[in-house]
């Protein structure tokens, strides 16, 4: 059995042991997304690439909400696992499955109907809007599949096993690349083929996780009673899931506003920011892994009523975040230009310079970004996910401010400082919020 109890042993060792498989999965996802981009660009041309790219922020808005909801649903499961309450854990799992199915059906219907108006609202250029629609409608029709994979993976992670979901993710990404080539080159399905490949391979990963859960975890063998609708349990799941989903979406709205502002500067700026953002996302993978780790660590230790360990875990993870920030700065300042050539041609001198300027301004602020992820996910894991939504709102506010006010005044330089501004805004809220949560949690544990 791969369950891992994070309430005992060295916090630093546990955090590293849990974060490394997550990091591998995140890096693999980035790698796969790069290969996907290369296939679409190479075989379908620049318009098809732009059509898929134009759906990026709205895709993150909706799919991010699904992922957030599933991660939130898993927090009460992690808490019951930490507390050793197996019966309660099973009732949460039963209600989690029912709620995920309901969310998936409702969201699919609403989003598929609103798909084209959303693209028009985002001022998607006329020459690519049909391609964008053909791509995103299939992705959105596959929302139930997104819920299946993210729900099962989040439940497995909440029991302390971060490795298994990553293995299935890697298999699914390899399958996705094969299906991309099949649908685009052999079946000539265009951008629709790329979308279909994504949905089918994610379905395979979800089914694998489901079978694994049923086979491997005795703790997850649900009796008839566990499947019964339980209003109290369902409410607790929604109280965790919906705020986490909203937090992803709120952050995405800020990015949509900023993207519109960048679009206004011109296509060279768009190309520079796209390349810079891709490298930044790749470099930030270890920070994302630290965040997800703290959600499970915080959940299990809060469930076990061990606040002292929560504080120790935060300290260990902050040290890791600081160390990694220095490594990232060194890598970007020494090899940033070479790394950007993964996404840009060497001949595009001016764009390359701008992209380099962008990534350097971002990486200097990786420690504030690390603190955003570590503290936000820890607060969520401890069961205070509504507070984390405010952090998302602070980020949205900062990106909106940059998009509406600073970019018109200072142009490209303002774009480069928009993310750092968002991270600092979020930290100004999150760090005091942690001490507030800590006091609340102490009071809750005292009164039982």
Where are these regions (language model features)?
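Short runs within selected transmembrane alpha-helices of multi-pass transporters and secretion channels
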Residues: 70, 139-157, 165-173, 194-209, ...
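Transmembrane alpha-helix boundary and packing residues in multipass membrane permease domains
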Residues: 22, 26, 38, 75, ...
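N-terminal transmembrane alpha-helices
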Residues: 6-43, 57-72, 76, 101-108, ...
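Short alpha-helical transmembrane segments in multi-pass integral membrane proteins
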Residues: 1-19, 77-142, 186-242, 298-365, ...
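Small-residue-rich hydrophobic transmembrane alpha-helices
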Residues: 49-109, 146-165, 272-336, 369-383, ...
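Helix-terminus/linker motif at the lipid-water interface of multi-pass membrane proteins
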Residues: 27, 31-49, 119-126, 182-189, ...
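Interfacial/gating helices of multi-pass transporter permease domains
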Residues: 40-60, 126-131, 191-192, 233-240, ...
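Transmembrane helical elements of multi-pass membrane transporters/channels
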Residues: 17-36, 138, 172, 201-205, ...
């Amino acid at each position: 059995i791969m369950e891992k109890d994070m309430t005992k042993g060295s916090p630093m060792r546990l955090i590293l042991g849990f974060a490394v498989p997550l990091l591998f999965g995140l890096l693999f996802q980035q790698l796969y997304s790069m290969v996907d981009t290369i296939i679409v660009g190479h075989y379908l041309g620049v318009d098809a690439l732009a059509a898929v790219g134009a759906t990026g922020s709205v895709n993150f808005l909706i799919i991010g909400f699904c992922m957030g909801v599933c991660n939130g649903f898993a927090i009460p499961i992690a808490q019951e696992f930490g507390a050793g309450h197996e019966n309660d854990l099973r009732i949460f799992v039963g209600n989690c499955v029912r709620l995920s199915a309901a969310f998936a059906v409702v969201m699919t219907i609403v989003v598929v109907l609103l798909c084209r108006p959303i693209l028009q609202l985002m001022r998607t250029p006329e020459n690519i809007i049909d391609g964008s629609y053909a791509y995103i409608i299939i992705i959105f029709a596959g929302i139930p599949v997104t819920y299946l994979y993210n729900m099962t993976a989040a439940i497995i992670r909440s029991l302390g096993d971060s490795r298994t979901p990553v293995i299935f993710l890697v298999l699914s990404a390899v399958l996705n690349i094969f299906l991309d080539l099949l649908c685009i080159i052999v079946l000539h399905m265009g951008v629709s083929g790329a979308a279909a490949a994504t949905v089918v391979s994610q379905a395979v990963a979800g089914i694998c996780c489901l079978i694994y859960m049923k086979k491997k975890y005795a703790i997850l063998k649900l009796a008839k009673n566990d499947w019964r609708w339980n209003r109290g349990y369902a409410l607790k799941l929604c109280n965790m899931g919906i705020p986490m989903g909203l937090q992803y979406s709120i952050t995405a709205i800020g990015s949509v506003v900023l993207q519109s502002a960048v679009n206004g500067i011109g296509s060279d700026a768009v190309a520079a920011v796209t390349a810079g953002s891709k490298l930044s996302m790749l470099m930030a993978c270890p920070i994302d892994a630290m965040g997800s780790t703290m959600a499970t660590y915080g959940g299990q230790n809060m469930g076990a009523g061990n606040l002292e360990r929560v504080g120790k875990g935060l300290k260990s993870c902050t040290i890791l975040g600081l160390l990694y920030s220095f490594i990232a700065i060194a890598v970007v300042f020494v090899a940033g230009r070479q790394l950007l050539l993964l996404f840009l041609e060497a001949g595009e001198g001016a764009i390359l310079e701008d992209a380099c300027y962008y990534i350097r301004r971002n990486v200097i602020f990786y420690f504030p970004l690390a603190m955003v992820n570590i503290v936000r996910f820890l607060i969520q894991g401890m069961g205070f996910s509504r507070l984390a939504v405010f952090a998302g709102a602070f980020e949205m506010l900062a990106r909106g401010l940059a998009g509406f006010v600073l970019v018109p005044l200072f142009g490209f330089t303002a774009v480069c400082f928009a993310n750092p501004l968002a991270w600092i805004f979020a930290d100004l809220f999150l760090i005091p919020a942690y001490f507030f949560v800590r006091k609340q949690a102490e009071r809750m544990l005292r009164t039982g």
